[in-house]
Amino acid sequence: MSRDLTAVQAKAATLVEALPWLATFHGRTVVIKYGGHAMIDPGLAASFAADVVFLRYAGLRPVVVHGGGPQIDAMLRRLGIEPVFAAGLRVTTPETMDVVRMVLVGQVQREVVGLLNAHGPFAVGVSGEDGRLFTAVRRSAVVDGHDVDLGLVGEITEVNPTVIQSLLDDGHVPVVSSIAGGVDSDGRRCVYNVNADTAAAALAVALGAEKLVVLTDVEGLFADWPNTDEVISRLTADELEKLLPGLAAGMIPKMEACLRAVRGGVAAAHVLDGRVPHAILLEIFTDEGVGTMVVP
């Protein structure tokens, strides 16, 4: 009895297409910022975990940096605390910081580690405080010409990647929560809430990563925002810098992270639609790719 081999041959063609990329990226580090809809949709979360484990089996060294804004908001409201934002950043009182720390390290990180470890004993959770991975100083913001006190919101000033390097060398997949240690205005040690996009970019630079991948809830960087007909597939750091002032507010920190990464030595930064199943594999291992790639 004859068989229709079309579907099987298509799978083989996909594998062959991936071959040069597998050779190019074998042994290279890829930092992935995980957030958005891909984090809260069970099917997309499972797809994300499969992609990361595939990278590990394919010989790459993936690192996951996660946020958790929706989960933090939900917990704050359960505790009777209304989330407050200024200049696109969470105003973080000491009480809010306790919730941020609890949710990121105790809830979201555990969920991501569990998803990955369903495929094997790979993932290890790490807080930005561990091994002094991230050190930050208090960040300020200006709204309508006035300084705004953001509380315990930090800007990363130093990255010590030793603990991450050790985990990678041992074959693990680090899962990093975006908080940082530091000192307050009185010189006392404290913990800061840091933007996960910024944290991922800083870590990618410190690790000498080949790629930074940022998952979003849009298709990529649009050529003529707010028109969404055309996505820019590739642009240089200089081209991106010129576009930054006109971007949607939610895209600015993500594209700034890409800019910092490539100017810090990362070979390429990618903004992908996390709502697309297996977007990471499509971007890294196919000729067409998806999303937007930023190069130096």
Curated annotation (Swiss-Prot):
Alphabetical UniProt keywords: Amino-acid biosynthesis, Arginine biosynthesis, ATP-binding, Cytoplasm, Kinase, Nucleotide-binding, Transferase
Record field: catalytic activity: N-acetyl-L-glutamate + ATP = N-acetyl-L-glutamyl 5-phosphate + ADP
Record InterPro entries: AceGlu_kinase-like_sf, AcgluKinase_fam, ArgB, Asp/Glu/Uridylate_kinase, Glu/AcGlu_kinase, NAGK-C
Enzyme class: transferase
Cellular compartments per GO CC: cytoplasm
Enzyme Commission number(s) from the entry: 2.7.2.8
Pfam families: AA_kinase
Site (Transition state stabilizer): K33, K254
UniProt: substrate binding residues: G68, G69, R90, N193
Record localization: Cytoplasm
Gene Ontology MF, one: acetylglutamate kinase activity
Pathway: Amino-acid biosynthesis; L-arginine biosynthesis; N(2)-acetyl-L-ornithine from L-glutamate: step 2/4
A biological process from GO: L-arginine biosynthetic process
Family per record: Belongs to the acetylglutamate kinase family. ArgB subfamily.
Role: Catalyzes the ATP-dependent phosphorylation of N-acetyl-L-glutamate.
Stated name of the protein: Acetylglutamate kinase
Primary gene name: argB
